Swiss-Prot record:
One of its GO terms (biological process) is translation. Pfam families: Ribosomal_L4. One of its GO terms (cellular component) is ribosome. This is Large ribosomal subunit protein uL4. Residues 47-77 are annotated as: Disordered. NCBIfam families: rplD_bact. The keyword RNA-binding applies. GO terms for molecular function: rRNA binding; structural constituent of ribosome. Disulfide bonds: none annotated. Part of the 50S ribosomal subunit.
Length: 207
């Protein structure tokens, strides 16, 4: 079973925690992780890009000049795709890009993403972290003490409004509750910062 150090808010080691093999020690399947990341990215797309065909562009109902006798190329409309400001051929139109994977596959991908973070030393466990009121400086100090200098994903056992409000103004830092995790958010962060209670909650949900 994988083991990781437990730190306090000051960044000092205060113990060690043994993680569940089923959740944090799963074998990583790069193909599955790639597929689930593609799914989450596809589901984020708005799909609102739109262009006008020659039938939708304003104007062009009249033949610009007679067919023969002018010495110019023949044209039937100034909104042909050949013309400047003409219609677009095979351009994008609003569509739904999203798709879904089976729940079992998504949960397996989440276990593998967490396991990959443990193996690469990118999972940090804090014994306890609570705020009485929103304070961005407190979260920034915690990350500094833990030597987190890239993007970070802070995971709490339950929804914590104070921590969420404190971290949302720090670039690259996200906060979520243990039951709301997904593989994309886990893989996107340079470091995962879990509270001990959050580790127990994740093991309860995914174990």
């Amino acid at each position: 079973m994988p083991k990781v150090a437990v730190y306090n808010k000051e960044g000092a080691t205060v113990g060690e925690i043994t993680l569940s093999d089923a959740v944090f020690g799963a074998e990583v399947n790069p193909g599955l992780l790639h597929e689930v990341v593609q799914m989450y990215l596809a589901n984020k797309r708005q799909g609102t890009a739109d262009t006008k065909t020659r039938a939708e562009v304003s104007g062009g109902g009249r033949k610009p000049w007679r067919q023969k006798g002018t010495g110019r190329a023949r044209h039937g409309s100034i909104r042909s795709p050949l013309w400047r400001k003409g219609g677009i051929v095979f351009g994008p139109h609003p569509r739904e890009y999203g798709w879904s994977m089976p729940k079992k596959a998504r949960r397996a991908a989440l276990r593998q993403a967490l396991s990959a973070k443990v193996k690469s030393g990118e999972l940090i466990v804090v014994d306890k972290f609570e705020l009485e009121a929103p304070k961005t400086r407190e979260v920034a100090t915690l990350l500094k003490n833990l030597k987190v200098d890239g993007s970070a994903f802070i995971v709490t056992a339950q929804e914590d409004v104070n921590i969420y409000k404190s971290a949302r103004n720090i670039p690259g830092v996200r906060v979520n509750a243990a039951r709301n995790l997904n593989a994309y958010d886990v893989l996107a962060a340079s470091k995962l910062v879990f509270t001990q209670d959050a580790v127990a909650k994740v093991e309860e949900v995914l174990g």
